[in-house]
Structures are given as C-alpha cells and as structure tokens.
Amino acid sequence: MKTAIVTGGSSGIGLSCCRKFLENGYRVYELSRREPKIQTVGVKHISCDVTDEHSVSEAFKKIYNDSGSIDILVNNAGFGISGAVEFTELAEAKKQFDVNFFGCFICSKNVIKYMRLQGGGRIVNLSSLAAPLAIPFQAFYSASKAAVNSLTLALANEVRPFNIKVC
C-alpha cells in the first residue's frame, strides 16, 4: 500500500486530497497544527507545525517507520493575509512566508531522504494564480506563492536523478 502525506489536510483542499487518496487505496497521513473538526475514517492525523523543522522531522520519521514508505507529499498548508503593503506589519509578512514558502521547503527537505532511500516519490506543491498575477492587497500571499513556484521548478531539477517528481 502506498503512503500519502497531506499538510494542512484538516479542511478545504487538503481534506479533499486526503479523501481522494483514500478512494485510491492509499494509507493517508494528515499533518496540521490542530485536530480536524471533521474526522475522516482512514486518515491518520499527526499534530505538526510545518514551520518547525523538528516537528516535521519527527512526524516524517514516525510515518516512515510506521508505513515503510512515503510515496507522495502534498504541500498544501498555507494561508493568506490581505491589506495594503504600507499597512502590513513585518511580523505578518514573515508569518505568511514562514507557512506558505518555508513550510513547503521544510517538508520537501525532510521527505527527500526517505524518497531517495526507496528509489523515488512525488512532491506536489500547491500554489495559486496569485503567484503570476500579483493581486493588489495580497502582495505577500502572491509573493509567497511565487516563491513556491520557483522552489518547485528548482527542486524538480535537483531530484530528477533520484526518480523524485516535483510539481
């Protein structure tokens, strides 16, 4: 049985991904800071903050030890802030990048070693049309998703020789 990890899988797009993986016979782990409001039978929740490298490392180690493989990682965790750049606090902008971009980086970095050990895998990074369109009053969301797009392209080339596909 293949194993899928979905970050931010407790609601919305992430929850839909979890359900689709279940339908297709995957063992599914959902990583989020909070327990899901809606429990999905068959989805194993692990409390994890994607901005905390130790938290991510421990979660992935547990999943790999329990399941013997990590075949797909869906980097879905993220959020958006709205407002004019001139009124946005630096701490808010940094938090946006911490979750949307650095969370994606931390999770990808930590899963690659397991995928290399098993001879391949797939990393899916969720982005947004806001990345190329740079939506007014969502500058930091747009910028964080544009950074995810660049990371995705660079990482895809780095790990291609190890049969790891990134999109």
Q: Model regions: which residues?
A:
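N-terminal Rossmann NAD(P)H-binding glycine-rich loop of SDR-like oxidoreductase domains
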Residues: 10, 18
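Conserved glycine-rich Rossmann-like NAD(P)H-binding loop of the short-chain dehydrogenase/reductase
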Residues: 24-38
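The beta1-alpha1 cofactor-binding region of Rossmann-like NAD(H)/NADP(H)-dependent oxidoreductases
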Residues: 48-58, 90
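Substrate-binding pocket helix/loop in short-chain dehydrogenase/reductase
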Residues: 84-85, 89-94
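Active-site helix of classical SDR
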Residues: 108, 144
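Alpha-helical segment proximal to the catalytic Tyr-Lys
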Residues: 113, 157-161
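Residue(s) in the substrate-gating loop at a strand-loop-helix junction
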Residues: 128
